[in-house]
């Protein structure tokens, strides 16, 4: 990267240290806990207008107040808006309420490894519906405002978990196969990367870049709230993956913030990053602590998922 050397221990604050985004508008989903809070904090420190898109308005307002108290007086502004990604009506209302250019959309919210098969009222498996379909509906719904920004960036927070499973197009919602919390999570994270690949190709002429990332192994995030001690202890045995070294929340938010604001990735699109650099392609998952699978970079898979997703959110 030109001018900077970033890595696994880089923090979000280091990424934005010399970045100024006055009069830029930002949306961060899931910004009431974990990495989402730190992402919002870092982006707000640049002077941007940051909207915290959250399920729990009270929690979101508390976070916004805490961030505002930490920042020096300046042009930055924090807003809080309700968004439940598993509820199509909530997503549609958020989209309807938005007006004007959107410069950065950080699709950060998610659920992880739900222990039991749960479906939305429409019959969609909950991890796929929340992690992918909700963000897909949000992003496509806001597309005209992203295009209006003349150089917008969309950031899709994925995971090493995409190595657990590709998108199983013939049974997205576990109607014909036994439910597994890890393959379900993996499928949704694979979809997050394929969204970036598909969006990059479709939105290039609008000046919109779309990239995906692995934030890292952040033990203090609320993402793993559904997991018990045994689930975490058996992680490697059940998934054939080795956990990467633990990061702080500040380090975990860094790659997302890099893709959102860094001049070093200007024009980069359709890529998958980890530890603030583009991830290497890996063909086998066993023993890996990182890397990206070929099936999530495949344009045909991305196109197929895009078409299916459009049909599912109608």
Regions flagged by a language model, labelled:
Residues 63, 195, 252-255, 305, ...:
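Alpha-helical packing segments of well-folded alpha/beta enzyme cores
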Residues 298-314:
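Amphipathic terminal alpha-helices
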Residues 2-231, 311-312:
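Rossmann-fold NAD(P)H-dependent dehydrogenase/reductase core
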Residues 69, 76, 287-295:
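Charged/polar, low-hydrophobicity segments characteristic of intrinsically disordered regions
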Residues 2-6, 188, 235-290, 297-303:
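C-terminal helical subdomain
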Residues 52, 83, 244, 294-297:
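Pocket-edge positions in alpha/beta enzyme catalytic cores
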């Amino acid at each position: 990267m030109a001018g900077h050397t970033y890595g696994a221990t880089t923090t979000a604050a280091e990424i934005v240290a010399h970045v100024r985004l006055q009069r830029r508008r930002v949306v961060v989903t899931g910004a009431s806990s974990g990495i989402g809070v730190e992402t919002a904090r870092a982006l707000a420190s640049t002077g941007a207008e940051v909207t915290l898109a959250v399920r729990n308005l009270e929690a979101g307002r508390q976070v916004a107040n805490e961030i505002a108290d930490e920042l020096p007086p300046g042009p930055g502004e924090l807003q809080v808006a309700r968004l439940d990604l598993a509820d199509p009506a909530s997503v549609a209302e958020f989209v309807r309420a938005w007006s004007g250019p959107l410069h950065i959309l950080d699709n950060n919210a998610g659920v992880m490894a739900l222990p039991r098969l749960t479906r939305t009222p429409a019959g969609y498996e909950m991890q796929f519906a929340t992690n992918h379909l909700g963000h897909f509906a949000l992003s496509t719904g806001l597309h005209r405002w992203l295009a209006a920004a003349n150089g917008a960036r969309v950031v899709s927070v994925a995971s090493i978990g995409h190595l657990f499973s590709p998108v199983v197009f013939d049974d997205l919602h576990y109607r014909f196969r036994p439910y597994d919390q890890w393959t379900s999570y993996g499928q949704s994270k694979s979809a997050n990367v394929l969204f970036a690949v598909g969006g990059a190709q479709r939105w290039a002429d609008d000046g919109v870049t779309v990239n995906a990332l692995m934030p890292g192994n952040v033990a203090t995030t609320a993402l793993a709230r559904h997991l018990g001690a045994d689930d975490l202890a058996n992680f490697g045995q059940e998934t054939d993956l080795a956990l990467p070294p633990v990061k702080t929340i500040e380090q975990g938010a860094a790659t997302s913030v890099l893709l959102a604001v860094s001049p070093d990735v200007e024009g980069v699109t359709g890529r998958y990053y980890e530890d603030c650099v583009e991830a290497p392609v890996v063909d086998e998952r066993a023993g890996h602590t990182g890397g990206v699978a070929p099936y999530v970079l495949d344009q045909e898979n991305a196109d197929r998922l895009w078409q299916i997703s459009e049909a599912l959110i109608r």
